[in-house]
């Protein structure tokens, strides 16, 4: 596939202000991981500059090797039993009104990391009773009893990303699959928790396939959708097929809202947790 030139609208300014430096210090001093840095998120400068970050639990090594993701793959270290408390303390220090947590996949663990997830949410609530929480979870191999452990910890929003359209999913996701992800979304929604999902575009999908994902998500009870441009992390990752124009992103947002989503964040640099603090108003 030929190299596709990155357009001007994807150029970003990563400026570091005092709040950015403070956020970095808190994250580093608590030996925490963020998807902002491991995933090379283009919004890191903006978010850290506002004092927000998406914490990544379960370590920094993932057991899966999806072709779009920059997170390190390999054999993870044992879970840090102090991590849930360290995350909760960092949220307290950062005075966050809304916290976003995600994780690597831990297919090496008997419970795939579900109990660690539940403990982290509980610790956040214990130390930050006024802070709302959004968690971006893996599929837990579709095991409903493990998904339920996270649901029972009662975060305000649970997100699970479809990542891409049905046709491209097996090409870029190493273990997850489209049907299992829909099952996760359905279980979240059926338990009365606001369900959220996200996809990348620019992988070679067609607009009608994006609409199919929207319809599939709405049928499971999903309320919030994020759509952003796929950016190839390194030459070893899946190539960008196309850079979607800002106008097409706006069109996707309009279509999604008309179909019934409560909110659709759709722009080239949108990522799963972008403007997450604004999504809490769509809870319930």
Curated annotation (Swiss-Prot):
Cofactor note: Binds 2 [4Fe-4S] clusters per subunit. One cluster is coordinated with 3 cysteines and an exchangeable S-adenosyl-L-methionine.
InterPro entries: Aldolase_TIM, Elp3/MiaA/NifB-like_rSAM, Lipoyl_synth, rSAM
Cofactor list: [4Fe-4S] cluster
Gene3D superfamilies: Aldolase class I
Binding positions for [4Fe-4S] cluster 2 per the UniProt entry: 62, 66, 69
Pathway: Protein modification; protein lipoylation via endogenous pathway; protein N(6)-(lipoyl)lysine from octanoyl-[acyl-carrier-protein]: step 2/2
Broad EC category: transferase
Keywords: 4Fe-4S, Cytoplasm, Iron, Iron-sulfur, Metal-binding, S-adenosyl-L-methionine, Transferase
Record-listed E.C. numbers: 2.8.1.8
Primary subcellular site in the record, as a coarse category: cytoplasm
Superkingdom of source: Bacteria
Residues annotated to bind [4Fe-4S] cluster 1: 36, 41, 47, 273
Domain called Radical SAM core: residue spans: 48-262
GO CC list: cytoplasm
Catalytic activity from the UniProt record: [[Fe-S] cluster scaffold protein carrying a second [4Fe-4S](2+) cluster] + N(6)-octanoyl-L-lysyl-[protein] + 2 oxidized [2Fe-2S]-[ferredoxin] + 2 S-adenosyl-L-methionine + 4 H(+) = [[Fe-S] cluster scaffold protein] + N(6)-[(R)-dihydrolipoyl]-L-lysyl-[protein] + 4 Fe(3+) + 2 hydrogen sulfide + 2 5'-deoxyadenosine + 2 L-methionine + 2 reduced [2Fe-2S]-[ferredoxin]
Keyword Iron: yes
PANTHER family listed in its UniProt record: LIPOYL SYNTHASE, LIPOYL SYNTHASE, MITOCHONDRIAL
HAMAP family: Lipoyl_synth
Protein name: Lipoyl synthase
UniProt source species: Phocaeicola vulgatus (strain ATCC 8482 / DSM 1447 / JCM 5826 / CCUG 4940 / NBRC 14291 / NCTC 11154)
């Amino acid at each position: 596939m030929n190299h596709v030139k990155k357009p001007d609208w994807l150029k970003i300014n990563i400026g570091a202000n005092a709040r950015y430096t403070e956020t970095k210090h808190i994250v580093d001093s608590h030996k925490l991981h963020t998807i902002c840095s491991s995933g090379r998120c283009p919004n890191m400068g903006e978010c850290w500059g506002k004092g927000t970050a998406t914490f990544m639990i379960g370590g920094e090594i993932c057991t899966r090797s999806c072709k779009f993701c920059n997170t390190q793959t390999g054999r993870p270290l044992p879970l840090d039993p102090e991590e849930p408390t360290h995350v909760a303390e960092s949220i307290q220090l950062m005075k966050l009104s809304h916290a976003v947590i995600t994780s690597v996949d831990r297919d090496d663990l008997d419970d795939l990391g579900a109990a660690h997830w539940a403990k982290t949410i509980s610790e956040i609530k214990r130390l930050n009773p006024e802070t709302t929480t959004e968690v971006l979870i893996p599929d837990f191999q579709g095991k409903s009893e493990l998904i339920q452990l996270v649901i029972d910890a009662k975060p305000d929003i649970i997100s699970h990303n479809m990542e891409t359209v049905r046709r491209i999913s097996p090409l870029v996701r190493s273990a997850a699959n489209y049907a299992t992800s829909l099952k996760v979304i359905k279980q979240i929604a059926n338990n009365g928790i606001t369900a959220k999902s996200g996809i990348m575009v620019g992988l070679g999908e067609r607009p009608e396939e994006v609409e199919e994902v929207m319809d599939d998500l709405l049928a499971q009870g999903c309320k919030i959708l994020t759509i952003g441009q796929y950016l190839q992390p390194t030459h070893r990752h899946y190539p960008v097929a196309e850079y979607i124009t800002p106008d097409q992103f706006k069109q996707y947002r309009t279509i999604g809202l008309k179909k019934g989503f409560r909110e659709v964040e759709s722009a080239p640099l949108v990522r799963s947790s972008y403007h997450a603090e604004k999504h809490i108003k769509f809870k319930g």
